[in-house]
Amino acid sequence: MVNVFLIIIAVVIPALVVLASLYLIAYFQHPDDKNVAYFPKIIVILGLTLAATSILMLPLDVANDGGSGGFPMDILWIIIYIAVAVFAVVICPFAMFFYESEEADPGAGSQIAGAFKGTFAILFAFTALTIVLYVFFGVAEIPTIVVLGRFQVLNYPFMSDISNITYALPEIAAIIGGNDERIRFDPGNPDLLGDGSEYVEYRLDKEFLQFRVSIALFIITMVAFFGWLLFIIFGGIGLVALPFDMIGDFKNRPQRIPYDKYLERKKKIGERATELVEIGKTIQSRTSGGIMSKRDRKNYNRFRQAIFLLEEDYERLKISYKRQGGKVIFYYAQFFGGFVALGVSLGWLLHIIIYMITAPEPFHPFLNSLVIALNNAWGFLGVIVYGLLSFYLLFCVVKGNFKFGLRLFFLFPIHPMRVGNTMMNAFLFNVGLILITSVSITHFCTMAFSQFTSTTAINSLFETAVKNLKILKWFWVVYIFGVFVMAVLTAIFLFIKPKDKPAKIRV
């Protein structure tokens, strides 16, 4: 029977996410994008709604209680994740290329033609890779043990200091009780008459049940795989960088300065700006044909990083003099938020150590106990805490991507989110990143809160099919370590080099 309350929640939550997305665009968008660029804005709203829905479906799956709530969650999960794949691979790239295309460029044809070219290249690469991997590795190998029977042992014929005894019948293996002692049992042996206090479970050797997964499920696996690669890098970086920068921004907040100091700093910024203008002209002249060499692309990324840091320095200078240091309460709120973020990051890292890495026999349930206790006290409390913890991971991914782009700017250009100064291509880039990593974050949370999600359809989807695919199953063994190791390396790196510095551009 369908649970009416769950239907209401399933409708209300996406509606709230849409409203939050509208506010996010209005708060962050650049003035040049006001009342224009409606198509990219619609894609941003739909993408954020889809990503948030995919994460918040996990509590809905828990409340559905193995299907008793009336929702076909196994089908809904596949629909949502296929939609995520379409948005991340096709729609967001198309909208981004469409926004960035220059109609004045005769080589681009039109905005739509330019967008189709870039999108087709991404779609072709993803489709080709998916087909090749599906043909060779689209088979799940489920470990199984064939149980022949469970019998009562009439006697325990060996002494406590002997761990292994072999009898006749070598084709039958047995496990006694809860111990891992393997013996051979001969039911015809008269020495086994006894009190019947022990049990023997007859088993064959471990076997693997093989079946080819559906192409839809394999596409979800591909998105999850790429999402995990991004989550390991950006999520691990963001877990440290987010609280680190929030606290560091308070320490380095703009201070009130006199007029002469303002003129001195403004002059230095002007000199940097003049130098960057000349560098920009040089880069533009070398790429007038629309094609960048590897070196030119690296220089372009360095150029964008230097421009961003220059703009940041100028904004801080204006706050220091024209606004007399700005609103102090904002920086104290950020300072407090930094310590809250630090606590959440430490909580996640501790949970990885004592619960996820030590599975299947974890040292302590930790966050599971918190969510379950709150869920038992009042269902929405558990959902709220889960939502806050999971969305925090999304913020860490966005922060990690930005931090990675600032420090390793030669790999790809940065797409910062700045209040009142964010172009739609930055929105689209970050929405695509959020969509891809939302799948891996849901998978991560399914394992992190496995006691909370044990009867869910998504747990069966990930644990049965996705985690047991050929070759890829070995990746799932190490990715939890990857997140933790990346966080530790980031902490070491940021303590050694805490400040972001402009790159040296070699033109």
From Swiss-Prot:
- Similarity comment: Belongs to the LIMR family.
Question: Where does it primarily localize?
Answer: membrane
Cite the PANTHER family for this sequence: LIMR FAMILY PROTEIN DDB_G0283707-RELATED
Q: Give yes or no: UniProt keyword Transmembrane helix.
A: yes
Pull one GO CC term from this UniProt entry.
Answer: membrane
In its UniProt entry, the species of origin is given as Dictyostelium discoideum
What InterPro entries would the database entry show?
LMBR1-like_membr_prot (IPR006876)
Membrane topology term: Multi-pass membrane protein
- The answer to whether keyword Membrane applies is yes
Residue ranges annotated as transmembrane are: 5-25, 42-62, 75-95, 120-140, 215-235, 335-355, 378-398, 427-447, 476-496
Compartment(s) of residence? Membrane
Listed A to Z, the keywords are: Membrane, Transmembrane, Transmembrane helix
Q: Which domain of life is it from?
A: Eukaryota
Supply the name of the protein. Answer: LIMR family protein DDB_G0283707
